[in-house]
């Protein structure tokens, strides 16, 4: 579960996030939309522990990021968070299986167990026959499936997806989004999806718009209130 309150982030004199609040329950998918430059990616970086907030709290599975030193924050990130990015971030000289297994390697999972878990996750995303394929042998949709498998293989409490379908054609994008959301829900992960795509946002349980440093309900989800919960 993700719980954020009073989050503030400044870059010099510019306040990007101003008292932002957000709560995402296990198994829930929340889409964040907004204009370019409103701080959507900054928000994900703060949640993922890649940047430090100026004020406020971020709790992931009950742990307040502000109470952790750099090493502990890295351990939490490896254990509890799965990342899916627009640019895939697939290691080019590793096979689909070797890419997928990386979070389990970082956690020190035994080789036999981690290979079995990665193989099962690749099968779950429709790549059971492509485990030995190198990235250059995979399509854009297949590469994003590898990225999803890698993000979910270690059973994270939280999945952060930053424009995960930005490089995909519309049909492939819909397939990949359905896969990401369904697998995250199956693993009971809280999911935050940042997107410019209305079609992508429509797959979420809630849609929140980031503007003037805060989140408000957007479109058909307005009945959920305006405080990000």
Predicted regions and their residues:
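Conserved switch/coupling elements of ABC/ABC-like ATPase nucleotide-binding domains
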Residues: 212-223
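ABC family nucleotide-binding domain
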Residues: 1-211
């Amino acid at each position: 579960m993700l719980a954020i309150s009073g989050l503030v982030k400044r870059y010099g004199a510019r306040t990007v996030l101003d008292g932002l609040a957000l709560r995402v329950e296990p198994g829930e998918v929340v889409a964040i939309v907004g204009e370019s430059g409103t701080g959507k990616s900054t928000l994900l970086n703060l949640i993922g522990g890649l940047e430090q907030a100026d004020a406020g709290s971020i709790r992931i599975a009950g742990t307040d990021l502000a109470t952790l030193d750099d090493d502990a924050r890295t351990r939490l990130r490896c254990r509890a968070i799965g990342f899916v990015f627009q640019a895939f971030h697939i290691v080019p000289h590793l096979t689909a299986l070797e890419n997928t297994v990386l979070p389990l390697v970082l956690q020190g999972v035994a080789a036999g167990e981690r290979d079995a878990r990665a193989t099962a996750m690749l099968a779950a995303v429709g790549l059971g026959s492509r485990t030995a394929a190198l990235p250059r042998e995979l399509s854009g949709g297949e590469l994003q499936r590898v990225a999803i498998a890698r993000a979910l293989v270690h059973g994270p409490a939280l999945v952060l997806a930053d424009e995960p379908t930005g490089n995909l054609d519309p049909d492939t994008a819909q397939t990949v989004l359905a896969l990401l959301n369904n697998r995250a829900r199956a693993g009971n992960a809280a999911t935050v999806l940042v997107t410019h795509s209305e079609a992508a946002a429509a797959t979420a349980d809630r849609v929140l718009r980031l503007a003037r440093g805060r989140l408000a309900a957007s479109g058909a989800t307005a009945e959920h209130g305006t405080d990000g919960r």
